[in-house]
Amino acid sequence: MDGIAFILIVGAILVFISLFFAIVPVGLWISAFAANVRVSIFTLIGMRLRRVVPSRVINPLIKATKAGINVSINKLEAHYLAGGNVDRVVNALIAAQRANIPLEFERAAAIDLAGRNVLEAVQMSVNPKVIETPVVAAIAKDGIELRAKARVTVRANIDRLVGGAGEQTIIARVGEGVVTTVGSATDHKQVLENPDAISKTVLSKGLDAGTAFEILSIDIADIDVGRNVGAQLQTDQAEADKRIAQAKAEERRAMAVAREQEMKAMVQEMRAKVVEAEAEVPKALAAALREGKIGVLDYYHLQNLIADTQMRDSISKMSKHDDSSSDKK
């Protein structure tokens, strides 16, 4: 009986020890104690109960303490519960301290929660980053297209990381400045001879306003001559003018054809009237003879005139026919 009780007691002790080491990270507490970081066992147990991974808070706290940064465990735990990256924030604080960059924990935590990489921002403040823009096509006043590529050296502005625009805004503004500068040049050769004029003009516009960066320099890495857009536009305009002129000429031709048909119709109408009038002549002669307005001699004289006229008309037609036949031969 005593043996069974002893076994039960030993088993209970083993279960208790297992649960204790499962709940309480003793190894982490020993590491913190060795690093002169005062953390109680109950604090670690409380983290477990609050579903906080103790190592995600204690290890950054050890690094901060060793680096001489005074930050409380409550702030680190609160930042972890807010969804922040505690380790990255502490690394950023250490890097800022080594580089003599003023950066408080609250500021670093706010930057991290805003979705920015605060450690990368601190590193970029020490070691500026070079942003390479895509090829920007611009057209000078003489119609020649120039294709330029720029390299922008920027340094992170920690004070404007929250709410400041990112790299894409810098790239867009630099591209706009290049297009404006090249477009204002009278001759594309001026730009090719002096490409640093683009850098000076673009840099003087304060393109970093409202962004999370400070532009240190803008350098034109490459510039090439593209298409002759002016000549192409003139060619297209000439082709368009040609088509318009052809359309107008076709319209005038159609109007002329329609007018010709109208005149032919009018000629036929006049001929019909002549025929109609000629049909009335015998009636008029008969009426004149009945009424005694003309005599028989006058009538025969009129017939002779008509016959003479017809004969002359026939002779003229025959002479025209002979002339045309001789021309064909």
Swiss-Prot record:
Signal peptide: none annotated. GO terms for cellular component: membrane raft; plasma membrane. The chain crosses the membrane at residues 4-24, 26-46. Keywords: Cell membrane, Membrane, Transmembrane, Transmembrane helix. Pfam families: FloA. Its main location: membrane. It is found in: Cell membrane; Membrane raft. InterPro entries: FloA. It is a multi-pass membrane protein. The keyword Membrane applies. Found in functional membrane microdomains (FMM) that may be equivalent to eukaryotic membrane rafts. FMMs are highly dynamic and increase in number as cells age. Flotillins are thought to be important factors in membrane fluidity. Belongs to the flotillin-like FloA family. Homooligomerizes. This is Flotillin-like protein FloA.
